[in-house]
């Protein structure tokens, strides 16, 4: 119990003075106690290293460790486990979503390649049809041109033949007239037209 100096002084002053014998005995006891206390203070060790305190220290250590274990197992570890489990589920969901997106991308690429192949095939078909159509149109135009040219050549040949026939007819007439005039100049008489015509035709043959 802690006692202040003033309280101890007041208590001492209020007590009656001891007798001479009692005073001597008290001094002797005080002297022996002081010596014993001095001896005890001089030979004392640090309390944590005092073997007499080991049992209590081990007890408190066990209690502290038990409380720490309970705190870790009931509070900290479940929270950490919950966080890890949540994180694992989130990672699994992310991986699943990534796989789904990859599958969608693969499907889109396959569809694009299929559409591209179909477009190329259709373009080739259209080009081939246009080429065939152009070839057919060219053949038709060439045939039309050849027919027109042949018709014009035939017309030209007919015209030339007509001109030639007319020219030959004119030449025959001129020859007959010339022959008749020559005969008339030579013989002094007019020649027979039928005879002159027969003679000119015979000479042309």
Swiss-Prot record:
Q: Where is the composition biased (Polar residues)?
A: 1-15
Look up the record and report any one GO term of the cellular component aspect.
Answer: proton-transporting ATP synthase complex
Low complexity bias locations: 16-26
UniProt topology in membrane: Single-pass membrane protein
Checking InterPro entries in the record gives:
ATP_synth_b/b'su_bac/chlpt, ATP_synthase_B_chain
Note whether Cell membrane occurs among the keywords: yes
Transmembrane residues, as ranges?
56-78
For this UniProt record, the keywords arranged alphabetically read as follows: ATP synthesis, Cell inner membrane, Cell membrane, CF(0), Hydrogen ion transport, Ion transport, Membrane, Transmembrane, Transmembrane helix, Transport
* Alphabetized Pfam families for the sequence: ATP-synt_B
- Give the Gene Ontology MF terms in alphabetical order: proton-transporting ATP synthase activity, rotational mechanism; proton-transporting ATPase activity, rotational mechanism
Question: Where is the protein found, in the record's own terms?
Answer: Cell inner membrane
**Chain positions covered by the region annotation Disordered:** 1-26
| Family label | Belongs to the ATPase B chain family.
Query: Self-association or partners: how does it assemble?
Result: F-type ATPases have 2 components, F(1) - the catalytic core - and F(0) - the membrane proton channel. F(1) has five subunits: alpha(3), beta(3), gamma(1), delta(1), epsilon(1). F(0) has three main subunits: a(1), b(2) and c(10-14). The alpha and beta chains form an alternating ring which encloses part of the gamma chain. F(1) is attached to F(0) by a central stalk formed by the gamma and epsilon chains, while a peripheral stalk is formed by the delta and b chains.
Sum up the protein's function in the record's words. Answer: F(1)F(0) ATP synthase produces ATP from ADP in the presence of a proton or sodium gradient. F-type ATPases consist of two structural domains, F(1) containing the extramembraneous catalytic core and F(0) containing the membrane proton channel, linked together by a central stalk and a peripheral stalk. During catalysis, ATP synthesis in the catalytic domain of F(1) is coupled via a rotary mechanism of the central stalk subunits to proton translocation.
Query: Any idea what this protein is called?
Result: ATP synthase subunit b 1
Supply the gene name.
atpF1
